[in-house]
Amino acid sequence: GFFALIPGIE
């Protein structure tokens, strides 16, 4: 998601 370090992992 938005707060993930790498976009897309959560």
From Swiss-Prot:
GO terms for biological process: monoatomic ion transport. One of its GO terms (molecular function) is toxin activity. It comes from the Eukaryota. Keywords: Ion transport, Membrane, Secreted, Target cell membrane, Target membrane, Toxin, Transmembrane, Transport. One of its GO terms (cellular component) is membrane. It is found in: Secreted; Target cell membrane. Monomer. In aqueous solution exists as a tetramer. Exhibits unusual shark repellent and surfactant properties. Forms voltage-dependent, ion-permeable channels in membranes. At high concentration causes cell membrane lysis. Shown to be 5-10 times more toxic, cytolytic and active in membrane pore formation than pardaxin-2. Belongs to the pardaxin family. This is Pardaxin-1.
